[in-house]
């Protein structure tokens, strides 16, 4: 395979890096649009986009221009001083989300950590015992200690226990279990409205409304994790805006595509939640720097007219995949929202991912049997048709 990692790259990483990643045998060199190219020049249609980060694909001319301009002006200042772009981006996020106040950080996990501190502070102002966080089984919120503590998958947690106390896990969409878990000690209810690492499973509107009701009843914060399922990917700014009626959280965390590859995470909160964090209680050295914020502002300018197209292409992609399922019996289900798509198989997914790599197609497997696709928002019907044609070829081989 022309894309097998060169010995120099692989050997250096084996010698000097922590061995925590199981990388695919591919060394990437450049990208353009929805495609990336390896060091041998082979082209790949990228349906995972840096795990949902590269929302506008690669080498987008408007982002490239902004990055070059800002790099020549100001990269970092710290939060000791103002710069020109944090305020406008915070306003953009507040208006897009329906919330009020923003905190900038560097990643989704860091945003979730800050949201949990917000919930802890909010709860302790009411009672020292109000520290419990209700989270969902099969969820994923990050790999830092707090985020891991509310991640409902044992495989991520077991090597680091005991974790932060107070987490209570309930099954997704089990309203009875949620009602039983909630009470006076509940500081927050946390959920992804579409579980990404968990296999692309959606939370129902009924469940989200019950979570909102219980948070109000017990004066807890409702926190929506939009790190993977939000920021345009569902065809709206955030996934909770697809609910009818919309369920507004107290706190929303987001990251991944916000600055299209430059690290940026956010906590967006209403006034009630934001009041829990005062001066000196939280901070970030790098969070919300001028480069990341300026790129994010440009991204939002590009995203606004793209939202209807995201919904359309996502629907078209799922339709084509469902057509494919009629011809391959091991495809159990196609599910998703916008351009967040899962194809559940009755066979292991990793061999499919490796065969796809061989055929110039990048995708990902989660939960052993779910092919996960988080493509760039600029994906076209032509790209979808190419992907489906390649998958049909790969599935024929797998079913032979």
Residue ranges, per PLM feature:
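Conserved N-terminal phosphate-binding loop of PLP-dependent enzymes in the Aspartate aminotransferase
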Residues: 2-400
């Amino acid at each position: 395979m022309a894309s097998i990692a060169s010995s120099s790259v692989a050997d250096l990483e084996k010698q000097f890096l922590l061995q925590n990643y199981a990388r695919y045998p591919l060394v990437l060199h450049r990208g353009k649009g929805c495609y990336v190219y390896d060091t041998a020049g082979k082209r790949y249609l990228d349906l995972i986009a840096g795990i949902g980060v590269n929302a506008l694909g690669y080498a987008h001319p408007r982002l490239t221009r902004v990055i070059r301009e800002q790099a020549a002006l100001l990269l970092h200042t710290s939060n000791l001083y103002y710069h020109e772009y944090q305020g406008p981006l915070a306003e953009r996020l507040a208006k897009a989300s329906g919330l009020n106040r923003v905190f900038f950080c560097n990643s989704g996990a860091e945003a979730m950590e800050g949201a949990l501190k917000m919930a802890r502070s909010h709860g302790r102002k009411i009672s020292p015992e109000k520290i419990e966080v209700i989270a969902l089984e099969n969820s994923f919120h990050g790999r830092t200690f707090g985020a891991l503590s509310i991640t409902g998958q044992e495989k991520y947690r077991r090597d680091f226990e005991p974790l932060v106390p107070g987490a209570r896990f309930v099954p997704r969409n089990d309203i009875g279990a949620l009602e039983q878990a909630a009470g006076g000690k509940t500081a927050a209810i946390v959920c992804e409205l579409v579980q990404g690492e968990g296999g692309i499973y959606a939370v129902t509107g009924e469940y989200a409304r019950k979570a909102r009701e219980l948070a109000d009843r017990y004066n807890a914060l409702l926190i929506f994790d939009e790190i993977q399922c939000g920021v345009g990917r569902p065809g709206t700014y955030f996934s909770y805006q697809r609910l009818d009626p919309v369920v507004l959280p107290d706190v929303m965390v987001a990251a991944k595509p916000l600055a299209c590859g430059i690290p940026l995470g956010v906590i967006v909160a209403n006034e009630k939640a934001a009041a829990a964090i005062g001066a000196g209680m939280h901070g970030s050295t790098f969070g919300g720097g001028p480069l990341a914020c300026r790129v994010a502002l440009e991204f939002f300018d590009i995203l606004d007219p793209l939202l209807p197209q995201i919904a359309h292409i996502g629907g078209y992609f799922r339709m084509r995949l469902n057509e494919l399922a009629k011809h391959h019996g091991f495809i159990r289900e196609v599910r998703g929202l916008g351009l967040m798509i899962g194809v559940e198989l009755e066979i292991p997914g990793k061999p499919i991912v490796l065969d796809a790599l061989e055929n110039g197609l990048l995708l990902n497997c989660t939960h052993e049997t779910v092919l996960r696709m988080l493509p760039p928002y600029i994906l076209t019907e032509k790209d979808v048709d190419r992907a489906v044609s390649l998958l049909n070829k790969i599935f024929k081989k797998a079913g032979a």
